[in-house]
Amino acid sequence: MNVMRRLKSIASGRTSISSDPGVDSSLKRPKLDQDNDNLSSRGDDPMQVDQSTDMVVVSQDTVAGTSNVPPPPDQLPEVMNDMRLREDEPHANRGEEDKDMEPPIVNGCGTETGQVITTTVGGRDGKPKQTISYMAQRVVGTGSFGVVFQAKCLETGEQVAIKKVLQDKRYKNRELQIMRLQDHPNVVRLRHSFFSTTDKDELYLNLVLEFVPETVYRALKHYTKMNQHMPIILVQLYTYQICRALNYLHRVVGVCHRDIKPQNLLVNTHTHQLKICDFGSAKMLVPGEPNISYICSRYYRAPELIFGATEYTNAIDMWSGGCVMAELLLGQPLFPGESGIDQLVEIIKILGTPTREEIRCMNPNYTEFKFPQIKAHPWHKIFHKRMPPEAVDLVSRLLQYSPNLRCTALEACAHPFFDDLRAPNVSLPNGRALPPLFNFTAQELAGASTELRQRLIPAHCQGTGNSS
């Protein structure tokens, strides 16, 4: 069933949102298990036919030339109708100015268990050169970009993650350039980097990262397997740290992550400190300069991207963060679209049909496009009856059609949903102290009003140097 028929069916009441155990609403379960934690990716032929839908699959280069002329009413815009978004390839589009390099999956080349990799670090800024050896232990993720494996530093015994990607010798690696700028408790840390070569004269970039053993995706799966909801204190902790990290990335580093999802959120299950990882899709967004719209994994993709917007903003990360928060509350994705186009249907089923002004804010080229009128589904019916109203309110503020109406990351951090974290004697479920939450730097708070600063930093932490 195509998008227009599905939407008209919903609008006429023939299709309803079915109930799901544990929630008051209609959220269909995704058919695909997303257990390809953070790094799996599938290579599609640039032009092929999806046999199940007769839908042509096109590469981003094909769609990049799509006309900006709006389609006639009751006809899907070409950018939505004549292609399937490459939602399973979040890494295939990284570096559009790098000629859309799609490196193959690495086989071997230093990733075999027990193999030792030796490199030299230092030698800059007065630091002496130092030889460091790593023993590969196990592969923790693979994809079209390369491979990530866990390794042990033989000199110190420290566990690290090494992300190994094929490097085009003609270009600098954007991910490396961005990671060198970053230093934040909620962003995975780059230890150092080095290049390696193969017998085929292939050049590989190796990013040595701090190793964090768990992902938010797997942490949530732990609860859903037991038919339980994640404790609200953990939802608060994880969502807060996502927002704090995004504020740092957006305001201090000046980059948009463009692939926020549970698989790209690392978490220490003892301290519950969260760190955003995988900056292979990240980019500094420059106003007026176009960007690819085929970015971000499907369930977490902002609607302006589905509409083919190329001059989007950091607000796409806030939409993704809202989707992650809703998923933590529900135990399953809020918008489980089965294709790029179905993703829009899932959004409309809950948010209702976007107004002409909302469509203009997402992509001004499609203001004349007419959708069947579907009423918004009340947010309080999406979640179970005992859900804190503050949680529902924050989700609704993040999941706005209009990018400029979404909370900024710093505004989200100050939301009342996180007031429990600011209480003087709050602790983790295991009795431990909370991870550092309020040790903001001057750069993180730059431009924030006095009122906002007072909301962000609890009274018992102000002026005390208390970092938690």
UniProtKB/Swiss-Prot annotation:
Keyword terms: ATP-binding, Kinase, Nucleotide-binding, Phosphoprotein, Serine/threonine-protein kinase, Transferase
An MF annotation (GO) of this entry: protein serine/threonine kinase activity
Matches recorded under PROSITE patterns: PROTEIN_KINASE_ATP, PROTEIN_KINASE_DOM, PROTEIN_KINASE_ST
Pfam families, per database record: Pkinase (PF00069)
Residues at the active site: 259 (proton acceptor)
InterPro entries on file: GSK-3, Kinase-like_dom_sf, Prot_kinase_dom, Protein_kinase_ATP_BS, Ser/Thr_kinase_AS, STKc_GSK3
Known tissue expression: In developing pollen.
Annotated positions binding ATP: 140-148, 163
Gene3D superfamilies given in the database record: Phosphorylase Kinase, domain 1, Transferase(Phosphotransferase) domain 1
Domain Protein kinase: 134-418
Entry comment on modification after translation: Autophosphorylated mainly on threonine and serine residues.
Catalysed reactions, semicolon-separated: L-seryl-[protein] + ATP = O-phospho-L-seryl-[protein] + ADP + H(+); L-threonyl-[protein] + ATP = O-phospho-L-threonyl-[protein] + ADP + H(+)
Phosphotyrosine modification, residue list: 294
Region: Disordered, residue numbers: 1-53, 91-112
Known EC number: 2.7.11.1
Family the UniProt entry places it in: Belongs to the protein kinase superfamily. CMGC Ser/Thr protein kinase family. GSK-3 subfamily.
Biological role stated in the UniProt entry: May mediate extracellular signals to regulate transcription in differentiating cells.
PANTHER family in the cross-refs: GLYCOGEN SYNTHASE KINASE-3 ALPHA (PTHR24057), SHAGGY-RELATED PROTEIN KINASE THETA (PTHR24057:SF60)
Protein name: Shaggy-related protein kinase theta
Native source species: Brassica napus (Rape)
